[in-house]
A protein has these predicted regions:
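Active-site recognition of the HExxH zinc-binding catalytic motif
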Residues: 27, 268, 440-463, 480, ...
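Extended, compositionally biased alpha-helical segments that mediate assembly or anchoring
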Residues: 595-724
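Post-HEXXH active-site segment of zinc metalloproteases
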Residues: 455-504
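Long, well-structured alpha-helical subdomains associated
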Residues: 19, 48, 492-495, 499-506, ...
Length: 736
């Protein structure tokens, strides 16, 4: 019997992202700008299919062909005639919606595979109009993905590197050691891994690695500017490396084409130069060009239409260095943005409150934009609640960054309507319902601005110049002079690799917990007196509960975490439990249904004392290890609290089973499309259900659907042999 965690439930929450009012307030020029940026984002987002699993592209194309010819309502009649029950057909729609929402058949939040919860998938494919019209092509598509569609062999249950899971950031014969030597090579050439994939081959008995850059240009000829000398053959540590361009080339061409059209409607020179550099980046595979575009983006203060695009977050690279493509376009929510602007203005007063010496903070706080946005488009594998970007350490440290809170995402994702309030005491539930969303708004603001936006990295550049006084700065954890730092081209991601993402999320979450105790912060968000105290309590209670819920994202077989944020929250739960003195309670109980359950409690009177002291000490350690590039110390600390075992005061392995028993599926979002009609841009909205989500995707790519699908399949076929190592007999041979 298949574990239910690998199915998406038929009653999964699906909600439309409301952006109609914000869009209608835009000028005609702003609407055109938003439209073409959205098109660029959506086409680039298709690269995520190729970054997720070997079968994702084939499943996507199969579904597109079916739904382009028959909308969900029409296809339902065919399904009934083919012998599917209404529950079976709903399961089919939910699976298809899940594939679109996650841009692949692995959950974007948790990296677990999901499979169709119906046995008659093939019967429906064969009965579809698409099959009647193109039976040979549809049968070939089905044969190429049908085994992997349902397969739950141990390695295929989750994303991972080597024997820990599936990844298409690396060829199937790569392991952690290959990722490490490739990172050393990239560092030696001052190349970023963000827009690369790694393919390991045998060249006459000698190991050869291909580093492939995402670019529209496929030839490795010399071109003007950065990257002209990076492509070619190299020898490094007795291994061969080939750096070449052309990954996702047809998709990058579309991205560049739409960006060029968006540039015509840019509001200012910063936006124009930003887009020019993005185009250069996606044309040549140049991260340096993307960094330059990001600099112009930072300078573009307070735009009405905000956007960002590229290979951004490294959560899903098992090694933690390669970025998943994402692009968003959003409209500023002025009322909410005023609160965040006040928080930015208070940042220089709040930063000294953080528990590390002044030398461990940036020399100067570069006040960023911090806006609340209503999302029009968010292309990629999932939609976050807030963002702090760019992720380039050198820019963040000395030039600045931007923060955004995605208001319409928060309104839907963190709504308490229909939520199962698991693991809470009855006495806490009403308070939790009332303050969950407001408290999370405070946490997101602090997490993004003063979490990700705080803290210095100690660096020695290529010329031997230090950004700190190594003869005076004392490590507060040892009482001795700082003895380690980042050298040359080393970055936070390249040094801390596999734990970097989760560790940094944990640091930012701790900053949020710590500073939400500040009355000035609470006042900025409109909370005073008892209301402010309730917001603090629910914020801490939410974090503790999230730490328990995080166990869903731990895989005992490989002893690995599949989601950076949830690992971070579990770590914080462990820290607060360790603090003792009755601050946090966690006990296993029997539920009213007779099944295992659990209850968490937080003593609100001890949050400002025991709780604050515990976070103070832990947060200081996190920052010190990060600032000093102390990988050994940081990893030992983080691994200690990340451990999930059945020993000690709490049996977390058994609690994990309870969490899985009572888990609730993550919501999916339906996003609108934009369409040019003469001189106007129309917003096309869809119903908030699985059918609406499906329609949004089929209509999104209908203009050049046949060519696009052919391009995707060709890209996937080219690399099919590279996945044979990890998929074994399940993957048909090349040429299928």
């Amino acid at each position: 019997m298949v574990d239910s965690q690998y199915y998406l439930p038929n009653d999964i929450g699906v909600s439309a992202l409301e952006c109609g009012e914000a869009f209608r307030l835009l000028s005609p020029q702003e609407k055109m700008y938003a439209h073409y940026l959205s098109r660029a984002a959506w086409y680039g987002g298709l690269a995520v299919l190729l970054q997720t699993s070997p079968e994702s592209v084939d499943i996507f194309v199969l579904l597109q062909k079916i739904f382009r010819r028959q909308a969900p309502a029409e296809l339902e009649k065919v399904a009934t005639a083919a012998g599917l029950s209404s529950e079976d057909y709903q399961a089919f729609l939910v699976y298809a919606a899940g594939l679109y929402a996650n841009m692949g058949n692995y959950k974007s939040f948790g990296d677990t595979k999901f499979i169709p919860n119906l046995p008659k998938f093939k019967a429906l494919v064969w009965a579809s109009q698409a099959f009647q019209e193109q039976s040979t092509e549809m049968e070939a598509l089905w044969n190429s993905c049908s085994c992997l569609l349902y397969s739950l062999e141990d390695r295929q249950k989750q994303l991972g590197l080597g024997d820990k899971g599936i990844t298409t950031y690396f060829s199937g014969n790569c392991c952690l050691e290959d990722a490490e030597v490739a990172q050393k090579f990239l560092d030696s050439k001052k190349l970023s891994a963000y827009n690369t994939r790694l393919f390991k081959k045998d060249n006459g008995g000698k190991v050869c690695y291909e580093v492939r850059l995402a670019s529209a240009v496929q030839k490795d000829c010399a071109v003007e500017g950065e990257c002209e000398s990076c492509c070619g053959n190299y020898s490094f540590e007795d291994k061969e490396f080939i750096v070449r361009r052309g990954d996702y080339a047809p998709l990058m061409e579309k991205v560049c084409s739409y960006l060029q059209q968006a540039e015509v409607y840019a509001a200012n020179e910063n936006q124009k130069k930003m887009i020019e550099e993005y185009r250069r980046s996606f044309t040549l595979g140049s991260i340096e060009a993307h960094k330059e575009g990001s600099r112009y983006w930072i300078k573009d203060k307070g735009p009405i239409v905000e956007s960002y695009i590229g290979f951004i977050e490294s959560y899903r690279d098992p090694f933690g260095s390669r970025g998943e493509f994402e692009g968003f376009v959003a409209v500023v929510n002025k009322a909410m943005s005023e609160r965040f602007a006040k928080l930015v203005s208070s940042a220089e007063v709040l930063l000294p409150e953080l528990p590390w010496p002044r030398e461990f903070e940036k020399d100067k706080f570069l006040k960023p934009d911090f806006t609340s946005l209503d999302v029009l488009t968010f292309a990629g594998s999932g939609i976050p609640a807030g963002i702090n970007i760019p992720n380039y350490d050198d820019i963040r440290q000395s030039e600045g960054f931007k923060n955004v809170s995605l208001g319409n995402v928060l309104a839907v994702a963190y709504s308490t309507k229909k939520e199962k309030l698991t693991f809470l005491e009855e006495a806490d539930k009403d308070l939790f319902l009332k303050w969950k969303s407001p408290s999370f708004e405070v946490q997101v603001g602090l997490h993004e601005l003063l979490g990700h936006g705080s803290g210095k990295l100690f660096v020695e550049d290529d010329k031997g110049k230090f950004n700190f006084d190594q003869s005076k700065v004392i490590n507060p954890e040892t009482g001795e002079l700082v003895s380690s730092w980042y050298r040359g081209s080393e970055t936070w991601d390249s040094k801390f690799s596999t734990i970097a993402s989760s560790y940094e999320e944990c640091r930012a979450e701790c900053v949020g917990l710590y500073l939400c105790l500040n009355k000035q912060v609470l006042s900025i968000f409109g909370h005073e007196g008892q209301d402010a105290m309730d917001v603090v309590y629910v914020n801490w209670l939410s974090m503790v509960r999230a730490g328990l819920l995080g166990l869903e994202f731990y895989t005992p077989e490989s002893k690995s975490w599949r989601q950076a944020h949830m690992q971070a929250r579990f770590v914080i739960l462990r820290v607060l439990l360790e603090a003792g003195e009755g601050l946090v309670g966690l006990e296993e109980v029997t539920g009213q249904d007779g099944k295992p359950d659990a209850r968490i409690t937080v003593d609100r009177s001890k949050i400002p004392t025991v709780g604050k002291d515990a976070i103070n000490s832990f947060l200081r350690k996190l920052q010190v290890y990060k600032a000093t590039a102390d990988v050994e110390g940081g990893r030992a600390l983080y691994d200690k609290y990340s451990t999930v075992s059945d020993s000690g005061a709490h049996n977390f392995l058994r609690l994990r089973e309870t969490v899985l028993l009572r888990k609730e599926a993550r919501k999916m979002f339906v996003q609108a499309n934009t369409r040019v009609n003469g001189d106007n841009v129309e917003l096309v909205e869809y119903e908030g259900n699985a059918a609406g989500l499906i329609r949004s995707f089929t209509e999104r790519f209908q203009d050049d659907a046949d060519q696009l699908e052919a391009d995707l399949l060709q890209l996937n076929r080219r690399d099919a042999p590279c996945w044979l190592f990890e998929l074994g007999s399940l993957l048909p041979p090349p040429g299928y």
